[in-house]
């Protein structure tokens, strides 16, 4: 544990280079296969922003009922504080692969705050078929396979199995279970290094997937000695099972809100933020690759300059596709459709409908930092954070014929003295266009401290936001007008 905390502190201070040294000529590891893989069961401890939050476990075994096939079982368990709530997360995956690590079948289960999502499927010669179940809803989907397809878990094995050598780059098509997307993973073998942060020497491998980069130091025998993600904010290192599982004790004693501390964009005070109708804001260190979905923003070098004006109409567009039910907002689900109609009895306009939905949610859905996969999860638990509120509002509104989309960005938090990442809605009002609505704050017209950055509700659509967290800073902000 001491090693992990030391690594995190050093890397966040920008001194990583002084802790890694060239280890001389790299050896050529012996050829290895899944059958000869030396480590069948590995545990790692996970640290986020200076606090131990969980562990991971990876097992490799021959498939009992399928000769010549192998199973990679992966598990990640985490516990952390967020906005005063004790959050528990468990990710479990079983990938069945061929001897060359290409994917054959898979079964994933994601559990957050008691809500579950399951993804199961198989990869054929040209098509990947899978089913997603969450909140009582299910979707069957297919994706086209154009080249050999690997599970994300195979990335830990591929460098060694394909002949690890400094200066080489490999590209693989990977199915990413958390986002249910096929994406290209790029792996560079960068160096052969030693470090006081781990024993011996190891190959430094940089992996890029879905715009995110992790760096792993892999020993000659295939063990992942150290791994860094989110620019060093997440650190994992090998531990024995007893030490890895001890995170439960440490997490129960941890009262720091590590997630808020890491993600908060500190800013000067904004008085009465929920009444701000026009605001200027400049964000520093904004990634050039991030496609901002906001007509009120413009790029100037590595800055994003935005004017949010609630008197100006939002961009127009075809709203009809935002009536369709989705896994996150299953507007055709009976319990959602029936309740929406009951809430809306007697309404004579879309504006009145929106007001009634917000009033009902304010009275019946508690505002707690509890995650959900679907609007049905929120309705049954009667509590949610901002994303869950946006899911439920979208499901209600779509069930009543109001095109509604889910958007993401930042909004000012008075208790925290800065901007937090936030999710809200935009509802289509005939003759006016898109209107920002925030069910968390009960706003039929969201205030101008809401800075929309990206639209979307699926995990795949939201991945780009991860590159902003802990990186972007507020250079200046000014509230120009209030209601």
Residue spans for each PLM region:
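Sec-dependent signal peptide recognition
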Residues: 1-7
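C-terminal motif of bacterial Sec signal peptides marking the signal peptidase cleavage site
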Residues: 12-14
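Acidic, serine/threonine-rich low-complexity disordered tracts
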Residues: 16-125, 160-315, 459-483
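Hydrophobic/aromatic-rich core segments of domains that either
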Residues: 24, 201-204, 210-212, 221-223, ...
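Active-site nucleophilic cysteine motif
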Residues: 50, 353-357, 382-397
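Acidic/charged, solvent-exposed loop-and-adjacent secondary-structure segments enriched in E/D, K/R, S/T
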Residues: 132-153, 357
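Generic recognition of flexible, low-complexity loop/linker segments
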Residues: 160, 190-193, 203-205, 213-215, ...
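Acidic low-complexity segments
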Residues: 295-383
